[in-house]
Amino acid sequence: MALLTLEEAKQQLDIETTANDTELQAYIESLTAPIERHVGPIENRLVTEQLDSRGSRLALSQVPAVSLTSITPVLAGGLAINVAALVLDGDTGVLWRRDGQFFYGGPWSVTYTAGRGTVPPTINLAARMLLQHLWRTQYGAARGGGGADDYSVTEPIPGFGYAIPNRVLELLEAFKAPPGVA
């Protein structure tokens, strides 16, 4: 699942021919990684990671988390935990035990589904705008002139460089992934 369709991309760029469809599809497919870097997974995917805790919570690294599939001990003699005995806060990716006990007997291999399932309209619009920005690097502005808009980014954005215009980041802000847990 891409963040936008070829037809949506062509509408955004005012392209009516099929001459650039192959190249445009490559641009479309390249949009997911930089946007997910800012907001976390959009397309649902299975994630397996190793976690350890001696506290009351485990924190998944990919959020939002849709469902928990399994949690199994990594080490021989580790404590197995039944998924039904856990509560998942999908938005934050935090797991805790229903009985209130601390996690012990780890580390564990945790498998879960992360993502949003569908592309929210605001993220779709952000993807369209990012596509338009990236397309300009090769083909120039298709609509009107002017380098005064924020597509001509002149200041690097920490962690993103020059690739994502401010207007795209502002659209993604409502979906921004929470900071990592150390």
Which residues does each PLM region occupy?
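Divalent metal-cofactor coordination and adjacent catalytic microenvironments
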Residues: M1-A182
